[in-house]
């Protein structure tokens, strides 16, 4: 009996030790990294291995989300997800759309619940929430490429701190191709950013155009039947493709806010109809006292808002209303009348009106409607956000000193200070005013790209280089708010592991270690690569031939690299209307090794291993008569130099994302080509 008791004690001790050891070694999965960060995570043990099957519960809307998810999964990881019916099995992904009150109360409009066990289940009470849940699964999957796209087991109930999370693109001063806007919708969706504002009209600065309003760049980018000839000729959107953009955005959970900016920033309209321009405040201002102004603007908005299927499909339309003169009380009151009129005019078509904050700058007596009006608070001197809250406006936090990008302008940010924003900012901070994190007056936050300096060499690729890290950062801060738990150092390192979006690579990032090698490049040859982004080196040996002007080495949809540029026959490149040249020509019969390197600041040419020329930023000055510098003459016969002290300058950029799509029709012999990226 004693022996049996001792044996039992030994067995019990062994079992306890085994249990202790197993508990000591067993680990639950820590919160995985995604952007925006999950608001909450309960880790479990082990990994989910996908079977390649998905199950849908919830009707047609859920089926549509599932099809989008399957297509994006294929594009991102290269594997098919196929639908199945019946009970899910281990490895299946289940999408559930349930609209009961309890789910709606727990998850809200955009929340979702993700449970990763033997089966992965995404549950939401709205289409938007279901879309966001699939974005999380996609981001988790792509970070496990080397492990077969497994997912860490655990669960989250995730919903945004702010209901509006967005970005504004200035398409008025610089045309942004529709292809990029479509990519931008997908990028924003991938990072759960739900609002894209498209600034459809604006104009350059008069001082860069000889101080002549008639010569100053101005554009309205949308097809217009009401006013034939109004639409910009250097790039525009047809109504049909603008509608298709909005439909695409709807699928991806993104709201498009179109903006027609009046009554300032309106030079495109006064170019078309000069009599509605202000003689007192400048032709970029509409004349608020001219009845023809209201007829014109009414007709413009009406074209895009009327009918059962209007061009502007979304719930919100932005009417501008920023930066008009407040020089006289009478003009302030008329500006307030104008603002109120167009808020109500837009609302008469069933839309919510949005405005730029201006009513502190234009403080007056004329009442301006505030109920259900969205106000973008960009500068507290123009609109005191706490006063605007008191008046009843719904605020969008877009403080210029923190979240405005003006590429290469030398004022505002060229690249946002993402570390400061990540560590210290949320939409509750508008300029120097701090609101409570849950203040219902604040709808959310946005950032913006303003293309102020027309003609400064900035391309869409340059804009994208500035935009994308800001998008990732604002995504985190508008969804997770003040509750981010990853350090900025970890965030900044780990964000690089994520794609821009499924099947989107606007930066032309190559996988680490990838190279393109071509032993002999033949005229007209395709390479299988469209382009290579910043941080590249393109090297080749060339035995020169007599190349006529315009001879192309490589071209893509975005750029052309010339062996002999069309103007002077030098090595150079062109994109988006800009032509940049190296002071170098291909010499007939001469064999050299050339290398071109490029980053976000410069493009360099090396000849036989030595730097020949660096094309970096160049400061250009507007030489205006008012800037003529005069000096006292020392005597009656002394001559006076003609010199200027320029008040206006821009920084011209000469960057290049190198094209590789197709070789040109050249005569030279090109061998030993190697392309790589840092």
Spans of model-derived segments:
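Acidic, contiguous N-terminal accessory segments
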Residues: 6, 23-160, 353-362, 369, ...
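Feature activates predominantly on carbohydrate-active enzymes
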Residues: 106-285, 292, 298-316, 451
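Short tryptophan-centered beta-strand motifs in secreted/extracellular beta-sheet-rich domains
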Residues: 196-198, 242-249, 538-540, 590-607
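Active-site neighborhood of glycoside hydrolase catalytic domains
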Residues: 269, 274-373, 378-392
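Flexible, acidic glycine-rich loops studded with aromatic residues
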Residues: 367-373, 380-519
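Extracellular glycan-recognition modules
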Residues: 513-572, 664-678
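Short, aromatic/His-centered strand-loop micro-motif at the edge of beta-sheets
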Residues: 571-593, 617
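Flexible glycan-contacting loops in extracellular carbohydrate-active proteins
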Residues: 615-670
């Amino acid at each position: 009996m004693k022996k049996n008791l001792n044996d039992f004690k030994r067995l019990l001790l062994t079992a306890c030790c085994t249990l202790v050891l197993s508990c000591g070694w067993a680990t639950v999965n820590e919160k995985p990294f995604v952007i925006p960060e999950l608001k909450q995570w309960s880790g479990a043990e082990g990994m989910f291995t996908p079977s390649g099957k998905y199950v849908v519960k919830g009707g047609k809307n859920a089926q549509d989300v599932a099809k989008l998810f399957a297509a994006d999964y294929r594009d991102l990881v290269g594997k098919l997800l196929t639908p199945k019916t019946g009970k899910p099995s281990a490895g299946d992904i289940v999408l559930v759309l349930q609209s009961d009150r309890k789910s709606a109360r727990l998850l809200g409009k955009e929340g979702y619940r993700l449970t990763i066990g033997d089966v992965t289940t995404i549950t939401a009470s709205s289409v938007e929430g279901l879309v966001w849940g699939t974005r999380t699964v996609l981001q988790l999957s792509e970070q496990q490429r080397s492990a077969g796209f497994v997912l860490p087991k655990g669960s989250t109930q995730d919903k945004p701190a702010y209901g509006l999370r967005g970005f504004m693109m200035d398409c008025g001063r610089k045309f942004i191709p529709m292809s990029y806007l479509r990519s931008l919708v997908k990028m924003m969706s991938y990072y759960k950013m739900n609002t894209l504002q498209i600034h459809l009209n604006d104009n350059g600065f008069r001082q860069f155009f000889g101080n002549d309003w008639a010569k100053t760049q101005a554009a309205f980018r949308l097809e217009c039947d009401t006013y034939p000839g109004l639409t910009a000729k250097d790039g525009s959107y047809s109504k049909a493709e603008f509608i298709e953009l909005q439909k695409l955005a709807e699928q991806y959970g993104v709201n498009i806010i179109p903006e027609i900016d009046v009554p300032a920033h309106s030079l495109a309209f006064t170019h078309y109809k000069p009599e509605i321009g202000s003689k007192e405040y400048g032709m970029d201002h509409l004349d608020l006292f001219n009845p023809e102004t209201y007829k014109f603007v009414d007709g413009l908005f009406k074209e895009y808002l009327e009918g059962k299927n209007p061009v502007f499909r979304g719930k919100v339309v932005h009417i501008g209303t920023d930066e008009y003169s407040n020089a006289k009380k009478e003009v302030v009151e008329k500006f307030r009348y104008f603002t109120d009129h167009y808020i109500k005019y837009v609302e008469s078509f069933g839309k919510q009106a949005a405005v730029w904050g201006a009513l502190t700058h234009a403080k007056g007596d004329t009442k301006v409607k505030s109920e259900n009006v969205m106000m973008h608070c960009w500068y507290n001197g123009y609109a005191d956000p706490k006063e605007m809250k008191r008046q009843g406006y719904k605020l969008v936090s877009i403080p210029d000193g923190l979240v405005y990008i003006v590429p290469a302008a030398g004022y505002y940010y060229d690249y946002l200070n993402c570390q400061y924003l990540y560590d210290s900012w949320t939409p509750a901070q508008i300029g120097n005013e701090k609101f409570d994190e849950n203040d219902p007056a604040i709808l959310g936050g946005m950032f913006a790209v303003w293309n102020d300096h027309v003609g400064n060499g900035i391309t869409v690729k340059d804009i994208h280089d500035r935009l994308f890290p800001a998008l990732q950062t604002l995504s985190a801060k508008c969804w997770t708010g003040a509750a981010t738990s990853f350090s900025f150092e970890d965030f900044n390192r780990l964000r690089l592991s994520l794609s821009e979006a499924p099947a989107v690579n606007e930066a032309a990032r190559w996988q680490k270690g990838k190279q393109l090698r071509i032993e002999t490049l033949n005229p007209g040859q395709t390479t299988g690569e469209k382009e290579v982004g910043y941080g590249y080196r393109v090297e080749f040996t060339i035995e020169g031939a007599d190349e006529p002007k315009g001879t192309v080495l490589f071209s893509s949809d975005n750029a052309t690299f010339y062996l002999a540029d069309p103007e002077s026959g030098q090595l150079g490149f062109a994109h988006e209307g800009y032509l940049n040249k190296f002071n170098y020509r291909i010499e007939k019969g001469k064999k050299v090794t050339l290398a071109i390197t490029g980053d976000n600041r410069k493009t360099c040419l090396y000849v036989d291993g030595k730097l020949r020329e660096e094309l970096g930023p160049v400061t250009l000055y507007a030489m205006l008569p008012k800037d003529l510098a005069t000096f006292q003459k020392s005597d009656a016969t002394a001559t006076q130099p003609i010199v200027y002290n320029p008040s206006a300058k821009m920084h011209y950029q000469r960057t290049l994302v190198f094209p590789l799509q197709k070789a040109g029709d050249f005569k030279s012999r090109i061998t030993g080509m190697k392309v790589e990226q840092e």
